[in-house]
Structure formats: C-alpha cells, structure tokens
A protein has these predicted regions:
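Hydrophobic alpha-helical
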Residues: 13-18, 22-43, 115, 133-194
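Hydrophobic alpha-helical segments within soluble ligand-binding/sensing domains
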Residues: 9, 66-94, 140-141, 165, ...
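Short beta-strand segments enriched in small/hydrophobic residues
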Residues: 23, 28, 65-67, 95-104
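Hinge/cleft segment of the Venus flytrap/periplasmic-binding protein
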Residues: 99-102, 107, 119, 188, ...
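Flexible loop/hinge segments that line or gate small-molecule binding clefts
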Residues: 31, 36-74, 189-198, 202
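Short beta-strand elements in bilobed, periplasmic/extracellular small-molecule ligand-binding domains
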Residues: 1-2, 96-101, 116-134
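Early extracytoplasmic/lumenal segment of secretory-pathway proteins
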Residues: 1-19
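Short, solvent-exposed amphipathic alpha-helices that sit
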Residues: 75-82, 106-126, 143, 167-171, ...
Length: 247
C-alpha cells in the first residue's frame, strides 16, 4: 500500500519489475505523477492492470493493459439522486453543498459532474458553494471543519472519495453539526458502513464493490497474462448505492 505516496509507489513497482513478475495490479496514486512508474513497468515487458484510479488517458492507451473502473459519471448521478431525495424529503429547496474532492484524478471530476447534473435537475435551487481537495483523511477533516465554519448555513457535504467522506463526517461531528449537516459519500469502508448505519450524519454512499472489483481484476489479469484479452482497455465494474448498511 503506497498510502498516497508517489515515491513509495515507485519503489514498490521497481521492486516488482526487478523480480520480473507476470503482471502488476495497482490503483495509481496520481494521474500524472504515477505515469513514469507505470511506463517503466510497461517498457520492462510487465503488463500493468489499473483499478479504480489510473494514469492519464494517453498513458493508459500506451502503457496500461487494462483499467477497471465504475463509470464515474453514473457513480455521481446515483449519489446526486440520493442527495435530491434527502433534500426533497426535508423540504430544503435551496440547499448549500460543499465538496471535498480528489480531483487530481479525472474520475473524481466526473463523479462531481454526475452528482451536480442530477441534483440540480431535481432540486434547481441547489448550490455548490465550495469545492476543495481533501483526499487523505486528516486533510479532509481539516478542510471540512473550515468549510463548516466559513459557511454557517451549509446543508451538506459531498465526499468524492472514502477519505473525503469519512473526513466530512468527522468534521461535522467535531463542529457539533450532527443532525444539521448531511454527508453524501463515496467508497465503502468498515468505518463508513458504521456511520451509515448510525445515519445521523452520513445519509448515502455510492461504492464499487470490492469483491466485484477484485473478481473482475483477477479475471482480467489472467486474460492479459495468457494473452486472451479482447483489446478493450477500460472495463466497467458495477456500481451500488447504499442508504443504510442492510441495502
């Protein structure tokens, strides 16, 4: 686990290249920053399979054997629908929403665009009042707290990633806004599932099932190694919406 560190990712991949492994599976740390690392592996003759995040499209076309991802626009639309349901049910016709983002990756930009498109079509008065980076948990908490303090009438926060989602929830709790500010998030973890079960702050999460993704990545990696891949590089994996953990 590179833990968001490009240098760690580079070291890990170089170690695998030196071992002459059959394939490398990774979720890229940075769309642009990880490009050289992926290129080195590819030029060493080792196929690279990305999941969830990858390098830029030009790099995918040239150096990546497969990229498995849930359609990010559809991902955002599902979350936007859930947010619209919440605002309509609570008779909030002009909600103010802040975004904590991971927009170093194009997939996160598309998640937000899908979210905004559906939300604003169903709740025309909705406003995105802020959009700040906070992919890593600690930063997401700090960003979330500052957004809450600077926007006293904030109604909700959208988290574009797991770290952003959990950070938003913790920021709401830290600022004693539970029950006043809702969070709509992305990417399920055990702690996020617990917050969804509690339902006081976190109202909905969209996720690409880890099990489904793992199975799809494993199957595609075997196809690549055995030279049975059909040439399709970007492979869509199913997306799920959760409004409570038993969904």
């Amino acid at each position: 686990n590179a833990q968001g560190d490009i240098s760690k990712e580079s070291t890990f991949v170089d170690t695998l290249v030196a071992r002459n492994v059959d394939a490398i599976i990774l979720s890229a740390v940075s769309e642009n920053g990880s490009s050289r690392t992926v290129r080195r592996a590819s030029e060493a003759g080792i196929p690279v399979i990305c999941y969830n995040t990858c390098i830029n499209q030009k790099g995918v076309d040239k150096y990546v054997s497969a990229y498995l991802v849930g359609d990010p626009l559809e991902f955002g639309k599902k979350l936007g629908n859930a947010a619209a349901d919440y605002f309509i049910a609570n008779k909030i016709d002009q909600p103010k929403i802040a975004v904590i983002n991971c927009e170093a990756f194009e997939v996160c930009v598309q998640r937000r665009k899908g979210f905004e498109e559906v939300l604003k079509s169903r709740v025309p008065g909705a406003q995105i009042v802020a959009n700040q980076e906070g992919t890593v948990l600690d930063k997401a908490i700090s960003v979330g707290e500052k957004l809450i303090i600077s926007t006293p009438d904030l109604n909700a926060i959208m988290g574009e990633s797991g770290g952003a989602t959990l950070g938003a929830v913790k920021a709401v709790r830290n600022q004693n806004q539970a029950g006043k500010i809702a969070v709509f998030g992305s990417d399920m973890t055990t702690e996020i599932a617990q917050e969804l079960e509690n339902n006081q702050v976190l109202k909905a999460v969209v996720d690409i099932s880890g099990k489904k993704m793992g199975n799809a990545v494993f199957a595609q990696t075997l196809k690549v190694i055995n030279k049975q891949a059909d040439g399709e590089k970007v492979i869509q994996v199913p997306i799920d919406l959760y409004t409570k953990t038993e969904d």
